[in-house]
Amino acid sequence: MRILVIGSGAREHAIIKALHTDPRVTALYALPGNAGMAEAICLPGDPMDNALVVQQALEERIDFCIVTPDDPLANGLVDALEAAGVACFGPTQAAAQIEASKVFAKELMRKYGIPTAGFAVAHSFDEGMKALQSMPCPVVVKADGLAKGKGVL
């Protein structure tokens, strides 16, 4: 099986290390990868460029692609690869919304009665200030969108 792992971080490094020991894996690629991923052939390119990743996957005859970084998931990379016939591990763009959008996640929890801290959505600074003044402290302020584990005020 020919496998492509998207990303260049520690998580992807661990996945490549594990896959390298599996005798069913006949070729292992990373895009973009890094110098520490000696077990994989690192392909050049931006994992946010869906067309490029699909092209690389088709050229290398990839059987299975693992997509774990948040940005390519939110950008719809799994959708693009699957549309081209490449099987993937990773959520679709729609499913990745739960991580990519704090507003989506909080509204989903509210809709289905999943316990979560109270929240307000503000679309301007003034709306945000009004919401803050109406809430008891402590308060967490977070922008909608991906923040790589950061972004809390």
Place the predicted regions along the sequence by residue.
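Short, glycine-/small-residue-rich phosphate/pyrophosphate-handling segment
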Residues: 100-132
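Glycine-rich, mobile lid/loop segments that gate access to catalytic sites or pores
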Residues: 129, 135, 151-153
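A short alpha-helix-loop-beta-strand transition element characteristic
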Residues: 88-91, 113-118, 137-139
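Glycine-rich phosphate-binding loop of ATP-grasp-fold ATP-dependent ligases
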Residues: 116-121, 139-153
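ATP-binding N-terminal substructure of ATP-dependent carboxylate-amine bond-forming enzymes
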Residues: 1-93
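Short, charged, surface-exposed secondary-structure boundary motifs
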Residues: 38-41, 97-103
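Conserved beta-strand edge residues that scaffold enzyme active sites
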Residues: 71, 95, 122-123, 146
